[in-house]
């Protein structure tokens, strides 16, 4: 929410680059759509040390995004194999993960497992 306005980013980057915004509430998602964002991040869904101090938005906001977003969105924040299905059950079809892969004993296998769950 503190980054360049999407219109200014578009002027600087041109029409071919994708511009996104992190959102933490439905009103922010709606504003991102009005502002011309190409996609949004929705989260953090769960508590995560990669976003310390950020309250999780939970599955209700992901469900709202799935119902109302006219642009692609990525559920993000504390998503891993153990809770991925619950995120997908909200209607989300795209997720972003960090620790589920980077902190896995076998990151390549963790990535394959997550991709299989997304099929």
Residue ranges, per PLM feature:
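Alpha-helix-loop-beta-strand connector modules within alpha/beta enzyme cores
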Residues: 1-25, 53-81, 114-119
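Glycine-rich phosphate-binding active-site loops on the catalytic face of alpha/beta enzymes
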Residues: 1-11, 41-53, 84-117
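Electropositive, surface-exposed helix/loop patches at the edges of structured domains
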Residues: 21, 35-39, 78-81, 86
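Histidine/lysine/aspartate-rich catalytic loop segments that bind and position anionic ligands
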Residues: 22-51
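Hydrophobic/aromatic ligand-binding patch that stacks against planar heteroaromatic rings
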Residues: 31, 65, 86
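Structural motif
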Residues: 35, 68, 89-91
């Amino acid at each position: 929410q503190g980054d360049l306005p999407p219109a200014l980013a578009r002027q600087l980057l041109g029409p071919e680059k994708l511009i996104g915004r992190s959102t933490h509430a439905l009103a922010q998602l709606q504003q991102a759509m009005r502002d011309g964002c190409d996609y949004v991040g929705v989260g953090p869904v769960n508590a995560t040390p990669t976003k310390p101090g950020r309250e999780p938005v939970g599955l209700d906001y992901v469900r709202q995004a799935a119902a109302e977003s006219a642009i692609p969105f990525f559920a993000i924040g504390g998503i891993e194999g153990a809770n991925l299905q619950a995120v997908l059950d909200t209607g989300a079809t795209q997720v972003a993960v960090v620790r589920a892969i980077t902190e896995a004993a076998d990151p390549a296998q963790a990535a394959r497992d997550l991709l299989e769950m997304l099929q």
